[in-house]
Regions:
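Glycine-rich adenosine-cofactor-binding loop
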Residues: 82-122
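A glycine-biased structural micro-motif
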Residues: 121-125, 148-150
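HTH-adjacent hinge/linker in prokaryotic transcriptional regulators
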Residues: 32, 36, 41-84
Length: 215
């Protein structure tokens, strides 16, 4: 299911992913849920829940709510995780190794099909799921010979190498990058980049911890 990027805010997509894991948890003991119940778990308003979901269609039944199983299927379809999406990791340092060795981090709908690094001492080594670490310069050849689409990369190199590595990935056909570095990438508007900065999230968490009103 595809939508025009300008029509949907990043916040809506972020909440959509939260709805999904909440629904999967609630599904263990309930078959249906309404917007009020979902909003309480999400700590938002029922109006916000209805607005978010109505962005993609009319899925609920007035006075009854949502069939949880069906809503999960719909959200997975919207997020494109109702099928397997191939992903490569570029940079097999501590972060890259952590991701490649713990597939649960990726969740449903994603599989690592290639790992790349520029360190000659790492190239050729076989790691998780019998994947061989390849030379980062071989990304284009790998994509061309792989049986299936590979246009998403997890960038886990050191900050100083991030921009150059990202540019090379784009040049070799990568269209979407999960940026695990703390460097703000400057790429074309046709390239999708999502930044994951753990330190920034900890800073955000710490602010709210320090400024949380006592009840």
């Amino acid at each position: 299911m595809k939508f025009k990027k300008l029509e949907i805010s990043e916040k809506v997509i972020q909440r959509l992913t939260e709805y999904l894991w909440i629904l999967k948890d609630v599904q263990k003991y309930e078959n249906e849920i309404n917007s009020i119940e979902l909003s309480k778990i999400m700590n938002t308003t029922s109006a916000q829940v209805r607005k978010d979901l109505s962005t993609f269609g009319d899925f609920g039944v007035r006075g009854k709510g949502y069939d949880i199983s069906k809503l999960i299927e719909i959200i997975e379809d919207i997020l494109g995780i109702n099928k397997v999406n191939n992903v490569i990791i570029v940079g097999h340092g501590k972060m890259g190794e952590m991701i490649s060795s713990n597939r649960n981090v990726l969740g449903k709908g994603f599989q690592i099909v290639g790992i790349f690094d520029k360190d000659k001492n790492k190239i050729g080594k076989v790691v998780s799921d019998n994947l061989e670490i390849r030379d980062v310069n071989d990304v284009k050849e790998f994509r061309e010979n792989f049986c299936g689409e590979v246009d998403t990369a997890i960038l886990a190199v050191v900050k100083e190498q991030a921009q150059f590595a990202a540019e090379q990935l784009v040049k070799n056909g990568i269209k979407a990058i999960l940026n695990m570095t703390t460097y703000k990438l400057e790429l074309g508007s046709d390239i999708t980049v999502v930044n994951i900065d753990i330190s920034a999230k900890l800073q955000e968490l710490n602010f709210w911890r320090l400024n949380k009103e006592e009840k």
